């Protein structure tokens, strides 16, 4: 997630889809034991209590089957990916191995930087693009790789709302797709204007 390490990857939501009140969060925290009563060292993977599923490989294979990665590789574009020390790093290394990777190492505290791909958190990436001078495009993802930020070759930031608008435009104009556009509550209302 783009949340700080102290969240430990968890986000608790209420019945209305928003965050829980601090009082409810405290009630939940109060029932969590200080120590783990289960000895995880004695649970064997062969015991059938745990099923190992390689979701990363499933995702990589899905992307390879649905995107023309060969065209991207042959395009000659100089691409950069900033994982912000998050979970997207391994999958993208398998999907686009010739991309230049930064912040692609495991660090549970994200080196103290909030792993949210917004301009103020991506100053290092912006400076890298400007200093290199030959970067065509740079992508950054948050801790769990479900939020993105984009830079053009001039080091200009493009936020996720504008990325969505660009994708809708591309799919309608160049791929000739028609139909409904589904968005999340947090998506820019300009998508509706564009889709109408």
What role is predicted for each listed range?
Residues 26, 30-60, 154-196:
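Proline/glycine-rich low-complexity loops and linkers
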Residues 3, 105-106, 143-146, 185-191:
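Acidic, glycine-rich active-site loops and adjacent beta-strand->loop/helix elements
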Residues 5-15, 91, 146-165, 191-194:
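Short Gly/Thr/Asp-enriched flexible loops that form oxyanion-binding sites at enzyme active sites
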Residues 82, 102, 140-142, 151-153, ...:
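Generic beta-strand/beta-sheet core signal
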Residues 8-133:
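Gly/Ser/Thr-enriched, mixed-charge loops and adjacent short helices
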Residues 133-135, 177-178:
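Short, high-confidence coil segments that cap the C-terminus of an alpha-helix
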Residues 78, 138, 180:
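Hydrophobic "anchor" residues on beta-strands that sit immediately upstream
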